[in-house]
Amino acid sequence: MTDAHLLANLCFGRTLQSFQGVILLAERGALVDARALLRSCAESVIAISALKVDSSMPQLLREEHDLHRLKLANALLNGDHALSAEAANDQRLIIKEIKAQYGEKGPRRINWEAKAKDGGTADLYTIAYRQASIDGVHLTLSTLGRYFADGAGDALPSFRFYPDNSNLDSTLFDACSAMLHALGVLTDWFGLPEHHEELRACIEDWKRM
């Protein structure tokens, strides 16, 4: 099994778990959190698609992992943290290890928009990944607006701390789109033609949603 195949399998595990989480949270009316998992689902599918076509993707995933390790180690050492001498030394060793491996240029960050274009998932990036970042993942006015009602007519403005189904349909539709795309890529890439007919039937059902 190649590194790309291994990572694609792991990404599919994350895709599946995030997809299931979207459904469970949407059923409870927790749309903000459901959309946060929609972004996670979309991100994993973008990665799977990029792994199929871009031989540099496994190395980029390693580099982004090391970039996060480097930033955290620097933050712990330079911040106002009560680190023990042993813990501080551990962070210095991480920094030394990564600098020795990558030199002054350091590890690279993944450009997910570019990878989505490479892997044929640009629409998924815009509709699911990017939109869910604005109204689900991050604390923005769009996210906070879900908890407030302006009031209509004589009704007073009020807080809405109760289940939300304002864009339930599109959230589930986009989650299904991401999941079906992942299955399409993997059945083709891993040579699983026995599942093509079942997948086509699922896609037709999705189109009727």
Each language-model region and where it sits:
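A cross-kingdom marker of C-terminal helix-rich interaction/assembly modules
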Residues: 1-209
